[in-house]
């Protein structure tokens, strides 16, 4: 669903490092999962958010429970935040600038998630 919307899957630790070690531009990294809140809220929210005028220059995802190596490497970049799936991270010039944890996604509508991300895009992209 995210890949169909133009989001690139990262399947290895090296692919995660290649994208997140870049020191210029913005990167959205989505930790996808099979849970209901990812399917019902997060993925639709991300898809809505990237219809905004401003958006990250790179859209990427790792899949918890499927791409373990890539997810473990991505989570190193999320510190000091604890592991959370699903979650959404926005990086600017190599720095983590915005992060939505599972508890921000659960119970939130796709529209709320999109609005939160779009506000971050306005500030950082």
Regions found by a protein language model. Give the residues of each.
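"Short basic amphipathic alpha-helical interaction patches in structured regions
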Residues: 43-47, 74-78, 101-104
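Short acidic (Asp/Glu) patches
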Residues: 71-85
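Non-catalytic, surface beta->alpha helical segment in thiol-disulfide oxidoreductase systems
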Residues: 82-125
């Amino acid at each position: 669903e995210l890949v169909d919307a133009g989001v690139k899957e990262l399947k290895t630790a090296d692919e995660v490092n290649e994208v997140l070690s870049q020191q210029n531009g913005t990167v959205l990294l989505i930790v996808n999962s099979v849970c209901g809140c990812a399917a019902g809220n997060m993925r639709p929210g991300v898809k809505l958010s990237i219809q905004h005028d401003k958006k990250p220059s790179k859209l990427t995802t790792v899949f918890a429970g499927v791409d373990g190596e890539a997810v473990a490497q991505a989570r190193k970049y999320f510190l000091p935040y604890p592991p959370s799936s699903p979650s959404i991270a926005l990086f600017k010039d190599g720095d983590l600038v915005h992060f939505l944890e599972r508890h921000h996604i659960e119970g939130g509508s796709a529209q709320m998630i999109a609005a939160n991300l779009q506000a971050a895009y306005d500030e950082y992209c």
